[in-house]
Protein backbone atom coordinates (compact mmCIF):
# COMPACT_ATOMS: atom_id res chain seq x y z
CA UNK A 1 0.00 0.00 0.00
CA UNK A 2 1.51 3.36 -1.01
CA UNK A 3 2.42 5.85 1.68
CA UNK A 4 0.23 8.93 1.78
CA UNK A 5 1.52 12.47 1.66
CA UNK A 6 -0.29 15.76 2.32
CA UNK A 7 0.46 18.44 -0.27
CA UNK A 8 -0.58 22.07 -0.47
CA UNK A 9 0.34 23.74 -3.77
CA UNK A 10 0.82 27.44 -4.33
CA UNK A 11 -1.93 29.92 -5.23
CA UNK A 12 -4.02 28.54 -8.08
CA UNK A 13 -2.27 25.17 -7.85
CA UNK A 14 -3.62 21.66 -8.15
CA UNK A 15 -2.39 18.56 -6.32
CA UNK A 16 -2.59 16.57 -9.56
CA UNK A 17 -0.10 18.76 -11.47
CA UNK A 18 3.58 19.61 -11.13
CA UNK A 19 4.96 18.51 -7.79
CA UNK A 20 1.82 16.54 -6.96
CA UNK A 21 2.18 14.63 -10.21
CA UNK A 22 5.83 13.91 -9.38
CA UNK A 23 4.85 12.57 -5.95
CA UNK A 24 2.32 10.22 -7.57
CA UNK A 25 5.00 9.10 -10.05
CA UNK A 26 7.17 8.23 -7.06
CA UNK A 27 4.43 5.98 -5.70
CA UNK A 28 2.73 8.18 -3.09
CA UNK A 29 -0.97 8.67 -2.52
CA UNK A 30 -1.30 12.45 -2.61
CA UNK A 31 -3.90 14.20 -0.49
CA UNK A 32 -4.29 17.89 0.25
CA UNK A 33 -6.20 20.95 -0.81
CA UNK A 34 -6.05 22.65 -4.16
CA UNK A 35 -5.98 26.43 -4.01
CA UNK A 36 -8.63 26.65 -6.73
CA UNK A 37 -12.33 25.87 -7.05
CA UNK A 38 -14.49 25.26 -4.00
CA UNK A 39 -11.64 25.44 -1.49
CA UNK A 40 -10.53 28.84 -2.82
CA UNK A 41 -14.09 30.14 -2.42
CA UNK A 42 -14.06 29.39 1.32
CA UNK A 43 -13.45 32.16 3.83
CA UNK A 44 -9.73 32.37 4.65
CA UNK A 45 -10.23 31.27 8.26
CA UNK A 46 -12.24 28.26 7.07
CA UNK A 47 -9.43 27.32 4.67
CA UNK A 48 -6.94 27.35 7.56
CA UNK A 49 -9.32 25.41 9.84
CA UNK A 50 -9.93 22.84 7.09
CA UNK A 51 -6.21 22.21 6.68
CA UNK A 52 -5.79 21.86 10.44
CA UNK A 53 -8.68 19.38 10.52
CA UNK A 54 -7.18 17.39 7.62
CA UNK A 55 -3.86 17.10 9.44
CA UNK A 56 -5.44 16.07 12.74
CA UNK A 57 -7.73 13.52 11.09
CA UNK A 58 -5.28 11.72 8.82
CA UNK A 59 -1.71 12.99 9.17
CA UNK A 60 -1.11 13.48 12.88
CA UNK A 61 1.62 10.87 13.31
CA UNK A 62 5.42 10.66 13.39
CA UNK A 63 5.72 9.12 9.91
CA UNK A 64 3.49 11.75 8.28
CA UNK A 65 4.90 13.67 5.32
CA UNK A 66 3.65 17.16 4.51
CA UNK A 67 4.86 19.31 1.62
CA UNK A 68 3.66 22.84 0.95
CA UNK A 69 4.63 25.30 -1.73
CA UNK A 70 4.44 29.11 -1.75
CA UNK A 71 0.97 30.28 -0.64
CA UNK A 72 0.08 26.71 0.34
CA UNK A 73 2.93 26.92 2.86
CA UNK A 74 1.42 30.10 4.28
CA UNK A 75 -1.90 28.34 4.78
CA UNK A 76 -0.12 25.35 6.35
CA UNK A 77 1.94 27.48 8.74
CA UNK A 78 -1.17 29.30 9.93
CA UNK A 79 -3.03 26.00 10.36
CA UNK A 80 -0.15 24.60 12.42
CA UNK A 81 -0.07 27.75 14.57
CA UNK A 82 -3.38 26.73 16.16
CA UNK A 83 -2.26 23.20 17.00
CA UNK A 84 0.31 21.51 19.20
CA UNK A 85 3.69 20.45 17.80
CA UNK A 86 3.30 18.58 14.53
CA UNK A 87 4.86 15.11 14.93
CA UNK A 88 5.72 14.40 11.26
CA UNK A 89 8.08 15.84 8.64
CA UNK A 90 7.40 19.14 6.87
CA UNK A 91 8.99 20.38 3.66
CA UNK A 92 8.31 23.97 2.63
CA UNK A 93 9.28 25.20 -0.83
CA UNK A 94 9.41 28.96 -1.42
CA UNK A 95 7.04 29.62 1.49
CA UNK A 96 5.15 32.86 1.88
CA UNK A 97 5.68 33.95 5.49
CA UNK A 98 4.06 37.39 5.35
CA UNK A 99 3.57 40.34 3.04
CA UNK A 100 5.81 41.07 0.07
CA UNK A 101 6.22 43.58 -2.71
CA UNK A 102 8.49 44.20 -5.66
CA UNK A 103 9.30 47.73 -6.79
CA UNK A 104 10.40 46.63 -10.27
CA UNK A 105 7.19 44.80 -11.11
CA UNK A 106 5.00 46.96 -8.88
CA UNK A 107 3.38 43.83 -7.52
CA UNK A 108 2.70 43.23 -3.87
CA UNK A 109 0.62 41.00 -1.67
CA UNK A 110 -0.55 41.29 1.91
CA UNK A 111 -2.11 37.99 2.97
CA UNK A 112 -4.65 37.81 5.79
CA UNK A 113 -2.92 37.91 9.17
CA UNK A 114 0.33 38.90 7.46
CA UNK A 115 2.19 39.48 10.73
CA UNK A 116 0.75 36.59 12.76
CA UNK A 117 3.48 34.02 12.05
CA UNK A 118 6.30 36.33 13.13
CA UNK A 119 4.34 37.63 16.12
CA UNK A 120 3.65 34.12 17.43
CA UNK A 121 7.15 32.84 16.72
CA UNK A 122 8.93 35.85 18.24
CA UNK A 123 6.88 35.45 21.44
CA UNK A 124 7.65 31.73 21.61
CA UNK A 125 3.99 30.89 20.99
CA UNK A 126 4.38 29.09 17.65
CA UNK A 127 4.44 25.29 18.09
CA UNK A 128 7.94 24.25 16.97
CA UNK A 129 7.66 21.45 14.38
CA UNK A 130 9.60 18.25 15.06
CA UNK A 131 11.12 18.29 11.58
CA UNK A 132 10.86 21.17 9.15
CA UNK A 133 13.01 21.93 6.12
CA UNK A 134 12.60 25.13 4.14
CA UNK A 135 14.05 25.83 0.69
CA UNK A 136 13.94 29.23 -0.96
CA UNK A 137 15.72 30.90 -3.88
CA UNK A 138 18.10 33.77 -3.23
CA UNK A 139 16.30 35.84 -5.89
CA UNK A 140 12.78 35.06 -4.63
CA UNK A 141 11.02 38.41 -4.17
CA UNK A 142 7.78 36.72 -3.06
CA UNK A 143 9.15 34.56 -0.27
CA UNK A 144 11.99 36.98 0.54
CA UNK A 145 14.92 34.83 1.74
CA UNK A 146 15.76 37.13 4.67
CA UNK A 147 12.20 36.85 6.00
CA UNK A 148 12.14 33.08 5.51
CA UNK A 149 15.51 32.71 7.25
CA UNK A 150 14.38 34.89 10.17
CA UNK A 151 11.18 32.88 10.60
CA UNK A 152 13.05 29.58 10.30
CA UNK A 153 15.43 30.61 13.08
CA UNK A 154 12.47 31.35 15.37
CA UNK A 155 10.85 27.94 14.78
CA UNK A 156 14.03 25.84 14.66
CA UNK A 157 13.58 24.92 10.98
CA UNK A 158 16.45 24.09 8.66
CA UNK A 159 16.62 26.59 5.82
CA UNK A 160 18.49 26.38 2.54
CA UNK A 161 18.78 29.43 0.30
CA UNK A 162 19.47 28.29 -3.26
CA UNK A 163 21.82 30.79 -4.89
CA UNK A 164 20.48 32.33 -8.10
CA UNK A 165 17.04 30.71 -7.91
CA UNK A 166 13.77 32.60 -7.92
CA UNK A 167 10.34 31.71 -6.58
CA UNK A 168 10.03 28.62 -8.77
CA UNK A 169 12.87 26.41 -7.62
CA UNK A 170 14.50 24.43 -10.46
CA UNK A 171 12.87 21.05 -11.12
CA UNK A 172 16.22 19.26 -10.91
CA UNK A 173 16.85 20.76 -7.49
CA UNK A 174 13.41 19.77 -6.19
CA UNK A 175 13.78 16.25 -7.63
CA UNK A 176 17.12 15.80 -5.87
CA UNK A 177 15.66 17.22 -2.67
CA UNK A 178 12.78 14.74 -2.82
CA UNK A 179 15.26 11.89 -3.32
CA UNK A 180 16.70 12.56 0.13
CA UNK A 181 13.71 14.03 2.01
CA UNK A 182 11.27 11.25 1.18
CA UNK A 183 13.49 8.56 2.71
Language-model segments: what does each one mean?
Residues 66-67, 90:
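Conserved alpha/beta-hydrolase fold motif
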Residues 35-38, 91-100:
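Active-site nucleophile loop of the alpha/beta-hydrolase fold
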Residues 41-42, 165-175:
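Catalytic histidine-centered segment of alpha/beta-hydrolase-like enzymes
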Residues 128-129, 133-136, 140, 148:
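Short beta-strand/loop motif that positions the catalytic acidic residue
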Residues 33-36, 160-166:
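Short glycine-rich catalytic loops that host catalytic nucleophiles or stabilize transition states
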Residues 16-17, 141-147, 170:
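Conserved alpha/beta-hydrolase "acid-adjacent" motif
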Residues 2-60:
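Active-site catalytic motif of lipid deacylating hydrolases and related acyltransferases
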Amino acid sequence: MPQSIYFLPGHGGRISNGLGQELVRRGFDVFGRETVGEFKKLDFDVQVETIAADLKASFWREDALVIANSYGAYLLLLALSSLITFPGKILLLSPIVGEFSNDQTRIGFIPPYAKRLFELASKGLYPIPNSCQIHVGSQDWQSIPDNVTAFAALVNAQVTVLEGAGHNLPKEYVASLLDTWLI
